[in-house]
Design a protein with these regions (language model features):
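Structural signature of outer-membrane beta-barrel channels/translocons
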Residues: 70-72, 112-116, 153-157, 164, ...
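Gram-negative outer-membrane beta-barrel proteins
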Residues: 86-92, 119, 128-134, 171-176, ...
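Short sequence motifs at beta-strands and strand-loop junctions characteristic
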Residues: 72, 99-104, 141-146, 185-187, ...
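Flexible, surface-exposed loop regions and adjacent strand-edge segments
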Residues: 95-99, 138-141, 181-185, 222-225, ...
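Signature for the C-terminal beta-barrel architecture of outer-membrane proteins
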Residues: 159-163, 180-336, 375, 388, ...
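N-terminal periplasmic/intermembrane-space "pro-region" immediately following the signal or transit peptide
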Residues: 2-6, 12, 22-100, 108-110, ...
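Outer-membrane beta-barrel "beta-signal"
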Residues: 380, 457-473
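Surface-exposed loop and membrane-interface regions of Gram-negative outer-membrane beta-barrel proteins
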Residues: 51, 90-105, 115-160, 172-183, ...
């Protein structure tokens, strides 16, 4: 514990110094430019009367390092982003004394060239991890310098027909099933073709893709037997004061292990819908349900999942919101009956969906959340959340946010009770280009984790600085 605190403090101190240096540099450039402005001539003897309505103050120009696009031709735009995050872990694997603290550094550079009805974008990325002594250090912690995105846009994003071809991010809805996972140091992209159709009543996205694998020492690649395709629609004309988003996703993967131990191909379809909207009494809701059917070799796949959330906006200072939420994902009742009932969460942005600690994913799960958030200072939201977890099936595993099995009791657990978690996090933009965020999570183990693991409680603080350069924000 003492070592993790020391390392966490050192890396945190480095991140804070780095952020303050960026802020100081931006202010210095701005101050220098103000000093270089010519001194206005003395006022004339006859003064012009002030206008009846005061003119709006002039817009403050961005700092010098963020003005690259002002000197670029109008058809070319660039943007850079540097992100530094310090993470700490106490009792990794729910084991006493397995403490760690490490830093995650990521740099991205993007350039977009635009013609009349076509545009091309390339994004380069380099992501590194330092001082990590427990667990893996490869992807998603490390992604050596490579092309992260490279795509062409045909048409305009606001036109009725729009296509994007190439390596790209794909995200739908709350990203519970398909997302870019940008919390991870490497993030996620697909080699894909995506076409968007827009009409007044609805929008439909159709895509065919393959997830990009981060490969150490060589260029990142897709393929390897992975196929992912589907359609996602959205309409605000069906439900009063609401939106419905039906979807269908098809996934194929090779070299997957069936219940009898043989290696075969996975092939399944996920159909579902998301509903979001407003209710009376300052309430809003968010509902999503999905059904999976398919095969993995000799196994039949029958799984489903659901998400139900209601939120109240409370009148008064600090703009408080109260949130209640329930999540369910089916688990496997019998690991030897050739029927797979564990829900596959596909390719989500899973961070903080089921707890800030990311020890729980949308598989074999019952999850309750109660939380509230306030904004006591302008542009500084603070959120507090309580989570409670149970397994859906005792003979199945507890799965992490990544989708990987985290803990299991062979033969079945004595209890489905996983544990409880409390979270707090906040963020604040120091400038339009510099954002500071931090949080802390603590997971109290229940009877299942005490049986399946050493059973010690788990905690994880983080501090993160994000700085945008070249572009305004």
């Amino acid at each position: 514990m003492r070592r993790s605190v020391i390392v966490f403090w050192r890396t945190l101190r480095s991140s804070i110094v780095c952020g303050l240096a960026m802020l100081a540099a931006s202010d210095a450039f701005a101050a220098q430019e103000q000093q270089q402005q010519p001194t206005p001539p003395p006022s004339a003897a006859v003064q012009t009367p002030p206008p009846l309505t005061p003119a709006a103050p002039p817009r403050k120009p961005p700092p010098f390092p963020n003005r690259a696009n002002e000197i670029m031709p109008s058809w070319l735009r660039v943007r850079g982003e540097f992100r530094e995050r310090v993470e700490g872990v106490d009792n990794a694997g729910f084991t006493a004394g397995r403490d760690d603290a490490y830093y995650l550094s990521r740099v991205r550079f993007s350039a977009t060239a635009t013609a009349k009805n076509i545009a091309g974008t390339i994004q380069l990325q380099d992501a590194r991890v330092g001082d990590k002594s427990i667990g893996p250090t490869a992807s998603p912690f490390t992604a050596s310098f490579d092309v992260r995105q490279a795509y062409a846009d045909l048409g305009h994003a606001t036109s009725r027909l729009f296509a994007r071809l190439g390596r790209q991010e794909i995200a739908f809805g709350d990203q519970r099933l398909v997302g870019h996972a940008n919390w991870l140091n490497s993030g996620r992209t697909f080699d894909a073709a995506r076409v968007t159709f827009k009409t007044k009543p609805a929008q439909v996205d159709v895509f065919a893709a393959s997830v990009v694998r981060i490969l150490p020492g060589e260029f990142d690649k897709s393929g390897n037997g992975n196929r992912f395709a589907g359609a996602y629609a959205s309409s605000g004309r069906v439900i009063p004061q609401g939106t419905i988003e039906p979807y269908v996703f098809w996934k194929r993967d090779i070299n997957q292990r069936a219940e009898n131990g043989i290696v075969d191909s996975l092939d399944h379809v996920t159909t579902g819908a998301r509903l979001v909207g407003k209710l009376p009494a300052r309430l809003d809701y968010n509902i999503e349900m999905a059904l999976q059917r398919g095969t993995l070799g000799p196994d039949e796949i029958r799984a489903w999942a659901g998400h139900w959330q209601i939120r109240e906006t409370v009148a008064g200072a600090w703009t408080p919101h109260l949130t209640g939420e329930y999540n369910l994902a089916s688990g496997d009742k019998n690991p030897a009956d050739n029927v797979r009932q564990t829900f596959d969460q596909l390719y989500p942005t899973a961070h903080d969906k089921y707890g800030l600690a990311d020890q729980v994913g949308w598989r074999n799960l019952h999850h309750l959340r109660a939380g509230f958030d306030v904004t006591p200072i302008k542009a500084t939201p603070i959120s507090f959340n309580y989570h409670s977890y149970w397994l859906a099936e005792r003979r199945d595993a507890l799965y992490a946010a990544s989708g990987a099995a985290l803990a299991r009791v062979p033969g079945g657990a004595a209890s489905r009770r996983v544990g409880q978690e409390i979270d707090i996090q906040a963020s604040r933009p120091l400038t339009p280009q510099l954002i500071l965020a931090g949080g802390y999570s603590h997971l109290f183990t229940g009877p299942f984790l005490e049986q399946a693991t050493p059973g010690k409680s788990y905690s994880g603080p983080f501090v993160m600085v994000t700085y945008v350069f070249l572009a305004e924000k």
